[in-house]
């Protein structure tokens, strides 16, 4: 065996994946390979479940069949150690990223078709160092790039296995353009260590029996379970299953086990003799197709690059664990309920049928209602812990402030004085200019008088245009600019003058009233003194 495993996609400690383009091109751009159609066989699944171990038996068959052209006894000698993709016993992961076997196996069909067979090994899912995104990315990439995706499972096809498959394949489907066709080709469930041969025999027939049971859709099922099964069927053009026995205690418990057939049970070896040709014999190879078109080896490089660019960017949503997804949905429900309560209470305060409120009063009511909404959010029982909840609480506060901004604008629209400000400003400008024009005309300053007449005309035309926009609903953007300009005139010029005049007027009235009060008091005092004096004279007489 002269080939080796080539790391074509590297996994970094920062939970990112990098394409090794040079290594990929070196394998696929060989003269004898690049123009051939490809069959890509990939094995994916949970870590430490024997994926690389299985692939090395695939390699034995490939070298026997396609290199030495003699597959009579392809399993090899009983004492030959297993070589190929790196594997070992134990509980820690061994493979990271995606590996490709450097030897590409070639086959020419009698009809002239030429095919290149590629084997991929993938990083195991659900180890202690991989995030959900890591697992989803590796599984999705291998599914998108392969024509046969082997889903390696332990002991049974369980509901959580199907849920993970749904998540990972949907993550892959999001990255592909929707062509209206099923996005992936063959999915091969491979159930390892099957312990119930009395229910379903080892091999493809027993696997089909179990697969039919697991993927069956019935009216008695919950809609969520029905949807999951329909999703899997909609993603793959072909779905099959194969049941394999346990390879034996010597394989599982011997730390020095190196893959020798003498340590493996006869049942396992018999299953290998059925499984491997079923997938890799010339008549059973599946051409890699994308959008119904067969893919050549040189084109596969472009697909590697395109798919990696998608997963390196931010175009796809972040896949989440079931706990995080449930907790997020739980919090979003609580946020929606709190926002609904805020909206109901604010409608009672300043809704469409309520009168205008002062800014201070509206702000007070907003704070009161906001506290009620936040209290309801806090009172809801939620998953995820305090830190998770705090993120959504802050988001809720921001959302409520944004909603309050809309209520403020709606409330201001009810202010009849503010609504009348624009026409009042332009009319006042016209009146002032008319008066100034008359004054300038009387003193002979006709240039200034004409200018005032011009400004008066512009103000009246603007007023007429504003009225047309207001009641016709057309040119609303320009109408908003007229309102803004009127507000500017009021705030910068007319309001200061108005306030100055009001202050002077109030000061004058207050001064006059004080003088009147003081003058009236003195007169009253003098009158009272005079009366008292008169009374005294009367008494003395």
Curated annotation (Swiss-Prot):
Transmembrane segments: 425-445, 449-469
An MF annotation (GO) of this entry: guanyl ribonucleotide binding
Domain of life: Eukaryota
E.C. numbers: 3.6.5.-
Outcome, altering residue 418 to H: Decreased GTPase-dependent fusogenic activity
First-level EC class: hydrolase
Expressing tissues: Ubiquitously expressed.
Binding site for Mg(2+): 52, 121
Reactions catalysed, as given in the entry: GTP + H2O = GDP + phosphate + H(+)
Binding of GTP, residues: 48-53, 192-193, 251
A single GO cellular-component term on record: endoplasmic reticulum
Lumenal side, ranges: 446-448
Keyword set, alphabetical order: Endoplasmic reticulum, Golgi apparatus, GTP-binding, Hydrolase, Magnesium, Membrane, Nucleotide-binding, Phosphoprotein, Transmembrane, Transmembrane helix
Segments on the Cytoplasmic side according to the record's topology features: 1-424, 470-541
Residues covered by the GB1/RHD3-type G domain: 35-284
Main location: endoplasmic reticulum
Entries under Gene3D superfamilies matching the protein: AHSP (1.20.58.420), P-loop containing nucleotide triphosphate hydrolases (3.40.50.300)
One GO process term, biological-process aspect: regulation of synaptic assembly at neuromuscular junction
Region (Linker): 414-422
Recorded phenotype for the gene knockout or disruption: The gene is essential with only a few escapers. Flies display a short life span and are sensitive to mechanical shocks. Following bumping they undergo muscle spasm, followed by paralysis, delayed spasm and finally recovery. The sensitivity to shocks increases with age.
Family matches, as CDD domains: GBP
Location of Phosphothreonine modifications: 514
Oligomer status and interactors: Monomeric and homodimeric. The homodimer, transiently formed by two molecules on opposing membranes, is the active form mediating ER membrane fusion. Interacts with spas; interaction may regulate microtubule dynamics.
Family of the protein in this entry: Belongs to the TRAFAC class dynamin-like GTPase superfamily. GB1/RHD3 GTPase family. GB1 subfamily.
Written domain comment of the UniProt record: The GB1/RHD3-type G domain mediates GTP binding and hydrolysis as well as homodimerization.
Name of the protein: Atlastin
Gene symbol of the encoding locus: atl
């Amino acid at each position: 065996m002269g080939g080796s495993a080539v790391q074509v996609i590297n996994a970094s400690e920062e939970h990112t994946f990098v394409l090794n383009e040079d290594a990929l091109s070196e394998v696929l751009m060989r003269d004898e390979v690049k123009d051939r159609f490809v069959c890509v066989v990939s094995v994916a699944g949970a870590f430490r479940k024997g994926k690389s171990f299985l692939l090395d038996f695939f390699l034995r068959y490939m070298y026997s069949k396609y290199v030495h052209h003699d597959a009579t006894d392809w399993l090899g000698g009983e004492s030959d150690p297993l070589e190929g993709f790196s594997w070992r016993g134990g509980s820690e992961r061994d493979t990271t990223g995606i590996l490709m076997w450097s030897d590409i196996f070639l086959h020419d069909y009698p009809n002239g078709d030429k095919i290149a067979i590629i084997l991929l090994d993938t990083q195991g899912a659900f180890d202690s160092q991989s995030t959900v995104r890591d697992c989803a990315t590796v599984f999705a990439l291998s599914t998108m790039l392969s024509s046969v995706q082997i889903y390696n499972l332990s002991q049974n096809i369980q509901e959580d296995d199907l849920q993970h498959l749904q998540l990972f394949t949907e993550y892959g489907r999001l990255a592909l353009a929707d062509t209206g066709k099923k996005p992936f080709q063959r999915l091969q469930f491979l159930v390892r260590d099957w312990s119930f041969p009395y229910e379903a025999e080892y091999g493809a027939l027993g696997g089909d029996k179990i697969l039919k049971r697991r993927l069956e859709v019935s009216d008695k099922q919950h809609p969520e379970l029905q949807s999951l099964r329909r999703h899997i069927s909609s993603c793959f053009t072909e779905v099959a299953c194969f049941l394999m026995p346990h390879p034996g205690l010597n394989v599982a418990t011997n730390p020095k086990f190196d893959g020798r057939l003498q340590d493996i049970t006869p049942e396992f070896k018999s299953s290998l003799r059925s499984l491997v040709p079923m997938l890799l014999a010339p008549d059973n190879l599946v051409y890699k197709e994308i959008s119904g078109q067969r893919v050549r080896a040189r084109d596969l490089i472009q697909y590697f690059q395109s798919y990696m660019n998608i997963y390196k960017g931010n175009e796809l949503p972040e896949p989440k664990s079931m706990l995080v997804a449930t907790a997020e949905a739980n919090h979003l429900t609580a946020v929606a309920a709190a926002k609904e309560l805020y909206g109901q209470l604010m409608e009672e305060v300043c809704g469409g049928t309520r009168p205008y409120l002062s800014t201070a009063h509206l702000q007070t009511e907003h704070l009161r209602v906001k506290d009620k909404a936040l209290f309801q959010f806090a009172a809801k029982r939620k998953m995820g812990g305090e830190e998770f909840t705090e993120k959504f609480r802050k988001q809720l506060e921001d959302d409520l402030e944004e909603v309050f901004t809309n209520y403020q604008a709606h409330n201001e629209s009810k202010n009849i004085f503010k609504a009348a400000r624009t026409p009042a400003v332009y009319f006042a400008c016209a009146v002032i200019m008319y008066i100034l024009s008359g004054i300038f005309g009387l003193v002979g300053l006709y240039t200034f008088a004409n200018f005032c007449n011009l400004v008066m005309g512009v103000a009246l035309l603007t007023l007429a245009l504003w009225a047309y926009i207001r009641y016709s609903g057309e040119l609303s953007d320009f109408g908003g600019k007229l309102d803004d300009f009127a507000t500017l005139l009021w705030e910068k010029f007319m309001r200061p003058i108005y306030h100055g005049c009001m202050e002077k007027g109030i000061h004058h009235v207050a001064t006059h009233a004080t003088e009147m009060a003081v003058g009236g008091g003195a007169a009253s005092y003098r009158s009272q003194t005079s009366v008292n004096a008169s009374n005294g004279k009367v008494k003395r007489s």
